[in-house]
Amino acid sequence: MLLQAFIFLLAGFAAKISALMTNETSDRPLVHFTPNKGWMNDPNGLWYDAKEGKWHLYFQYNPNDTVWGLPLFWVNMTTGVDNLFYIDKFQVREVK
C-alpha cells in the first residue's frame, strides 16, 4: 500500500516536471524555487503546517538587485502537499 502511494506520488512529480520542461524559454531551474526577479538568499524555515495543510518557505529577498543589499525583505511562500508548486504570492516583511 505504501509502495503504491509512493509510486503514484513519484509519477505525479514526473508528469509535472515533464510539463515544465516544455518551457524552453526559461532560464530558471525546474525544481529549485526562485523568484521572478531580484536576489534571494538560501531558503530557510521550511516547515509543514498540518492545521492548514501547507508547506511554508522563508527566505531573504532583494527585489531591486541581483546581489545582497538593501532594501531587504523576509518572504513567506506557501504550497500544498506536493511541495513543488508554490503560490506566487509573496507575504513580505521588510528587514530594518
UniProtKB/Swiss-Prot annotation:
Active site (UniProt): D42
Protein residues bound to substrate: W39, M40, N41, D42, Q60
Enzyme class: hydrolase
Annotated signal peptide: 1-19
GO CC terms of this entry: extracellular region; fungal-type vacuole
Residues the record marks as carrying a glycan: N23, N64, N76
Record's catalysed reaction(s): Hydrolysis of terminal non-reducing beta-D-fructofuranoside residues in beta-D-fructofuranosides
GO molecular function term, any single one: beta-fructofuranosidase activity
Gene3D superfamilies to which the protein is assigned, alphabetical: Glycosyl hydrolase domain, family 43 (2.115.10.20)
Family, as annotated: Belongs to the glycosyl hydrolase 32 family.
Protein name as catalogued: Invertase 7
Native organism: Saccharomyces cerevisiae (Baker's yeast)
Gene label: SUC7
